[in-house]
């Protein structure tokens, strides 16, 4: 009798687990299904897929699994925000022509932030939303330092450009993508405080007018969102954290290792204090991140659902 009771209990317990799991699976169906396709845009030295490793590690797959249409753009790894923006615009136009969609939801990381802003500014009719993650909207102290240390027109600048071009050529080779024109000095200029503020004069949509506030939530029919991390060393198992920690010393304010928190603000600031560094924001280095913070992939899923709830 005791054995029968145990078997019945186990059966009921197993059934409840299966039912709970099934219910969870069903509840996730369509969770990320936005009205318009999502386009992910990489930052400086970025790529779509490099030697089998995604720039947005595991993110497109997770979003697609529960209903989203996701496309990963590939623009110049190094170039001005405007040049990268024109490349992205051409890809957006092609995507809309193929899919029949009317608009896209643009999500950009790092230099991808200004890049997607450019597209939304010149063709707001094609963009439903702009989401910047760790975006450089008021410059980076790192870019300022590099520009200040390497004199314009110097031999050291020529050497640095040569090394950068070699790295970018390797990225193009390993990513198997289109060989976009590269201009390391243009990208450096774009990411300095001076370059960013100049860009903002021409493309001001969503940029906060205060030092560390929020920008307009909606401009020309386009919704603007942003979020970022505010930590440098987040997991001792991640070797890239050493670099993030050292580079982060350049700042005298909260930062993610490459960009100051206040510089990442655009439109509606979802959060700017995640325990994530610049690479964690894209689930970088194969997903190694802080054990005491939300999984980066979850943030993208939640945001896709946010866009869905907004009818985007």
From Swiss-Prot:
Positions annotated as active site in the UniProt record: 110, 256, 278
Gene for this chain: hlyC
EC code: 3.1.1.3
Induction: During infection.
Swiss-Prot/TrEMBL cofactor(s): Ca(2+)
Cofactor: how bound: Binds 1 Ca(2+) ion per subunit.
A Pfam family the protein falls into: Abhydrolase_1
Family membership: Belongs to the AB hydrolase superfamily. Pseudomonas lipase family.
Protein name: Triacylglycerol lipase
Annotated positions binding substrate: 44, 111
Species of the source: Vibrio cholerae serotype O1 (strain ATCC 39315 / El Tor Inaba N16961)
């Amino acid at each position: 009798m005791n054995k029968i009771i145990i078997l019945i209990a186990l059966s009921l317990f197993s059934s409840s687990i299966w039912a709970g799991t099934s219910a969870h699976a069903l509840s996730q169906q369509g969770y990320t299904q936005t009205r318009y396709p999502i386009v992910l845009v990489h930052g400086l030295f970025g790529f779509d897929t490099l030697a089998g490793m995604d720039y947005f590690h595991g993110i497109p797959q997770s979003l697609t699994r529960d209903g989203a249409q996701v496309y990963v753009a590939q623009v110049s790894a190094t170039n001005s925000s405007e040049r990268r923006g024109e490349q992205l615009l051409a890809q957006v136009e092609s995507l809309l022509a193929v899919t029949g969609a009317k608009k896209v939801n643009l999500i950009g990381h790092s230099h991808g932030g200004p890049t997607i802003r450019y597209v939304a500014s010149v063709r707001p009719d094609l963009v439903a939303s702009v989401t910047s993650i760790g975006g450089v909207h008021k410059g980076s102290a790192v870019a300022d330092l590099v520009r200040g240390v390497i004199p314009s027109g110097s031999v050291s600048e020529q050497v640095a450009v040569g090394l950068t071009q070699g790295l970018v050529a390797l990225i193009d080779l390993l990513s198997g993508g289109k060989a976009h024109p590269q201009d390391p000095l243009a990208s450096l200029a774009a990411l300095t405080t001076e370059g960013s503020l100049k860009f903002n004069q021409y493309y001001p949509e969503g940029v906060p007018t205060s030092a560390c506030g929020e920008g307009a939530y909606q401009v020309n029919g386009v919704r603007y969102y942003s979020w970022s991390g505010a930590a440098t060393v987040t997991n001792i198992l991640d070797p890239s954290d050493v670099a993030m920690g050292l580079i982060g010393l350049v700042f005298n304010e909260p930062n993610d290792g490459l960009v100051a928190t206040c510089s990442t603000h655009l439109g509606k600031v979802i959060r700017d204090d995640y325990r994530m560094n610049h690479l964690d924001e894209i689930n970088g280095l194969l997903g190694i991140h802080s054990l005491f913070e939300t999984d980066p992939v979850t943030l993208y899923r939640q945001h896709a659902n946010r866009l869905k709830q907004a009818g985007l």
